[in-house]
Regions:
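Transmembrane beta-barrel domains of outer membrane proteins
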Residues: 38-40, 90-92, 102-106, 170-172
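Membrane-embedded beta-strand positions of outer-membrane beta-barrel proteins
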Residues: 5-9, 52-56, 101, 127-131, ...
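Residues that define the transmembrane beta-barrel architecture of outer-membrane proteins
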Residues: 3, 27-33, 93-99, 123, ...
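Short loop/turn motifs that connect adjacent beta-strands in outer-membrane beta-barrel proteins
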Residues: 2, 42-50, 108-124
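Transmembrane beta-strands of outer-membrane beta-barrel pores
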Residues: 9-15, 58-64, 105-109, 131-139
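A mid-sequence, solvent-exposed acidic-amphipathic segment
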Residues: 111-142, 156
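Glycine- and aromatic-enriched membrane insertion/assembly motifs of diderm outer-membrane
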Residues: 3-4, 9-14, 22-81
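Extracellular/periplasm-exposed beta-strand and loop segments of Gram-negative cell-envelope proteins
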Residues: 18-28, 64-94, 137-148, 152-166
Length: 172
């Protein structure tokens, strides 16, 4: 079993009416960060192909609306609405603790030295298929605006009707 520190980042967006085009969210401003730890265990004693990869990560997912909008919790729904103030920043952030699990195919070869076989890892192409499950443990909205030269920043914490349990499929 080997361990590995994980740091990942990328872009977030939502599919609306079957497309990402004309999104309600900024393409480059909506992104995610992830950091965590994974463990990789070879499944077969005498073969290096199959590994079980598992661990934990903390994920920060940000959505930044377009056109001076912000998220408004209307009871059972959270809607995007135009804010009467001119905002310099509007962002909804979900922070999740996730447990990823993957079946990894590692095509690294083996080395034989002094009649002992050593299985190399991470020396060749790898492919992982699996999924993740986790908990949302914080949702907050950050808005920044300026009124008559006074810069303000408001942070509102709440559920914003986000799911407490998250899950999904993933590949790498």
């Amino acid at each position: 079993t080997t361990s590995q520190f994980v740091f990942a980042m990328g872009l977030n967006n939502l599919v609306t009416d079957g497309a990402v085009a004309n999104s309600d969210y900024r393409y480059w401003g909506s992104h995610f960060y992830e950091w965590g730890m994974t463990y990789n265990t070879r499944i077969a004693k005498n073969n290096n192909l199959l590994h079980f990869k598992y661990g934990f990560s903390v994920m920060y997912n940000n959505l930044r609306p377009t056109e001076n909008r912000w998220f408004v919790d209307n009871g059972t729904t959270t809607d995007l609405e135009v804010n009467p103030l001119h905002m310099g920043e509007s962002r909804l952030r979900n922070v999740n603790l996730v447990l990823p699990m993957h079946l990894e195919f590692d095509f690294s070869g083996k080395t034989i030295k002094d009649d002992k076989t050593y299985y190399n890892t991470h020396k060749s192409f790898r492919l992982g298929i699996g999924g993740f499950a986790g908990l949302n443990f914080k949702t907050k909205q950050v808005i920044e605006y300026d009124i008559d030269g006074y810069e303000s920043r408001n942070v509102t914490k709440g559920s914003f009707n986000a799911n407490d349990f998250i899950y999904g499929l993933s590949t790498y």
